[in-house]
Amino acid sequence: MSFLLLLVGLGQPVYGQYTSIQDTARCLSVRDSSATEAFGKNTDRQVTAYYYANKASLVDKYFRRGMSRISILNIPKGKRPAPESYLKRRYIRRHLKYFKGGASCIVSKAMLERYDGDSIGKADNSQFIMTKAEMDSVLTKSHGDLSCIEHELGIPSGAWKHRVLVRIDIPKPKKLRLRMASGNEVGANVLWLPGGLLPTGYREAVIDRIPKGKYKASLIVLTGEVNDGLAVPNKNEQK
């Protein structure tokens, strides 16, 4: 098991072992989960598709006159305007308030340890985040299924295959210049949408690179994958 020197709490250095995050929906037995899997997936797709469509349409009314998601997406990456120029101020304030309870993101363990956990983020001093509450929801509903995690977070399918993933929690993102994403960030991919929502409807924002002492790292356990030499069997294969 790997160890990583982290600075936590009030900046006191401690040697901390990664905390493993497994399926938190323990109220369901394996038998119950297997029996309802197909029905649950079909129903979930129908409900969430309707929910996301309505959530996105609510954002549209907060674009300033003459601006829209399509008009912003038609501008090449690197030249897109600041969100404040096309989104109403009250919407931005309300959107960022959701991050008051903390923020989270996912990175690869290899990337984190490459620089000894010194800081997390892209070369342009940016890191995409979502609310801690919604990250909890994503990891709970995914049941350790990597493809589900990728889909929910707007990550191209297979991009994280064969990687050991680490959840990063940031208790106070506001202190790291919490802001709306412009779409010019290095981490903005082809699935990025103006307005602060992922394609699946979760809220996102951007902060500066996260230094030591400002985050907590937890290992994500995936079903059917090997993490640090420990194989985690698929739930449906358990007896």
What residue spans do the PLM features occupy?
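Long, low-complexity, intrinsically disordered regions
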Residues: 16-127, 136
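Catalytic toxin/effector domains delivered as secreted proteins or via bacterial secretion systems
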Residues: 78-238
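Bacterial Sec-dependent N-terminal signal peptides
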Residues: 1-19
